[in-house]
């Protein structure tokens, strides 16, 4: 047998390395140019974001200034792709002292036809918050640390004992059509609620929501996303008085993790909301984020809960999963609570069925799937 020369071996090694680099780059390009394939975001013409962006409308950003510039740049009709590398501190190390200051410096408005994707496993937004108010937006493979309002407001009429309330969610989808949130992690992160102390006899809450959908937003899918360590998580529909939301707020949340989430996972008004293959884990006696309820059944809500897995210590029965907030219908099919079938007595006449194709896992397969795949850094 003739042995290859050193030159030939080196050429072969170089070719292998080059092919691996090309494959890696190709895989990353696929992440940035993917379009929505599941849930409500596939309807109304689909959700494509900046998947067809021209090369000169693709930005890689590593700091707040670059991110803001990419969001504000004038681009062509095919939109933009913004690739986030590493941790971005939107405050640039200058702490917010007032709510107004946080609004002025921390707000990140996402234009229509935009894809935002983390390209490193540690891609993260801190000290900032996203607003999606324009159509056709995709956010993937990113950690968002829930914003911390420096000036919570006391409301003596909130509940029987009053409460502290704050502004700003990690992501607010407001009035926009066709939004896909995929493999994103939302967390209180470095500032958990036990660090905030109390005032007026109540915990001083510096967080608002993690991800809210409101004011007529429509055709939204949240997939393989992780929500961790948060109190009031997802609000779909902001007010009982917004009757114009009826027929809108079509949202799918699937194969997502809710870990130590106290409430609003999600709380719904008006919307046709499909919740399937989600894994909820927590405890009614958790020292910081005690479980209160998962699905809030609000005015004219039409929730279809399907094959979700709830592992919540200290609770039993559907009334602790589906909380009554003024709604009248709720359909669950095939979900489990602590390993046994969830049985609900709500009227299941929600009046709609999903118009898109999907193949849900059985509830006993959900935990393994979600823990392996949900959240930032886990796109296959």
Swiss-Prot record:
Question: What disulfide bonds does the UniProt entry report for this chain?
Answer: none
Transmembrane residues, as ranges?
Answer: none
The UniProt entry's GO CC annotations, sorted and at most eight, read: extracellular region
An individual GO BP term:
pectin catabolic process
GO molecular function annotation:
metal ion binding; pectate lyase activity
Any idea which positions bind Ca(2+)?
Answer: 169, 208, 212
* UniProt source species: Pseudomonas viridiflava
Name of the protein described by the UniProt record: Pectate lyase
> Which enzyme class, named as a word?
lyase
* InterPro entries (UniProt xref): Pec_lyase, Pectin_lyas_fold, Pectin_lyase_fold/virulence, PEL
Part of which pathway?
A: Glycan metabolism; pectin degradation; 2-dehydro-3-deoxy-D-gluconate from pectin: step 2/5
Give the signal peptide range.
1-29
Q: What is its main location?
A: secreted
